[in-house]
Amino acid sequence: MSVRLVLAKGREKSLLRRHPWVFSGAVARMEGKASLGETIDIVDHQGKWLARGAYSPASQIRARVWTFDPSESIDIAFFTRRLQQAQKWRDWLAQKDGLDSYRLIAGESDGLPGITIDRFGNFLVLQLLSAGAEYQRAALISVLQTLYPECAIYDRSDVAVRKKEGMELTQGPITGELPPALLPIEEHGMKLLVDIQHGHKTGYYLDQRDSRLATRRYVENKRVLNCFSYTGGFAVSALMGGCSQVVSVDTSHEALDIARQNVELNKLDLSKAEFVRDDVFKLLRTYRDRGEKFDVIVMDPPKFVENKSQLMGACRGYKDINMLAIQLLNEGGILLTFSCSGLMTSDLFQKIIADAAIDAGRDVQFIEQFRQAADHPVIATYPEGLYLKGFACRVM
């Protein structure tokens, strides 16, 4: 008999709607013993089977669902099916957009909770973020080796969220050669260098691909400020769009150095690119106080909120930074502003920008809305998968 997680009465509704998480508060009891990450059956209070998932006793998310099909086992064949299904969509995108790099697996939205896989050329970068994902590591790697024999696999499971599920952080080569210090990839006609081993996340923010492309239509002959620039994807795109100048700001010397190399790699005019190592909040105030003005500002900060208790503080941070940006824009200027915080809804983010405009004493028009690129899909039953949102705003 399999180990069963029994839900409290009335707590099965989210699973009936095929949401992939079971929170600790929904659990009545365990029947049997399961190790960290082991596959268990999830049943309602009367014993009716609901789903099969991975058990995580130390996490607020007590189980993550692998399947809602009672006949489906969690084995090599299961992971093969999931990966092949995901690859079909990425193949179409890669051919349509001329991509050599994309998100192959987007966790819950691809039916593989806690698993992120990014492909950069012939390197697969793996992040296992949940106990169930870690438990299935060997099976997953076996399937990847079979389906992608041409690819080396590199582990970037050096993410703090693993500690919440009782796991250590891991990083390093799994199979094949070590990634080069900087790996060139292609995106919408740009060549970009990616630091797989030491860069943010898996090395690069693939989710902003379409937003970087959209930037080009706003920047011709414009002065652009690129905040939280990282390795300069928005800066390179702005230069390709014909901007007169782009100022990239980041606290990381290493990231700015790669940004400079990316400008040179694309044979763009380096004299139009300025790189400033500074705190964005501080620099925006300095620019405001000395009367600097820009025509376009890209505001792409890191995640400000990790849990609900931080949401109010994050709202203040987003409002302050967008208020400063709005103050720095010329009349008719464009603010391209983003939030990658999953707890920040699009409606709330739009309200924050409206409040920022009021505090800045400017009128703002919302003219375009952004989300993560299409290789980061959002399954309908898991709205939390829509974490990246953004707006193009015209400042009057």
Swiss-Prot record:
Pfam families linked to this entry: Methyltrans_SAM, PUA_3
Keywords in alphabetical order: Cytoplasm, Methyltransferase, RNA-binding, rRNA processing, S-adenosyl-L-methionine, Transferase
Domain PUA: 2-81
Presence of the UniProt keyword Amino-acid biosynthesis in the record: no
EC top class named in words: transferase
Protein family: Belongs to the methyltransferase superfamily. RlmI family.
Functional description taken from the UniProt entry: Specifically methylates the cytosine at position 1962 (m5C1962) of 23S rRNA.
The protein's name in its UniProt record: Ribosomal RNA large subunit methyltransferase I
Species annotation: Escherichia coli O127:H6 (strain E2348/69 / EPEC)
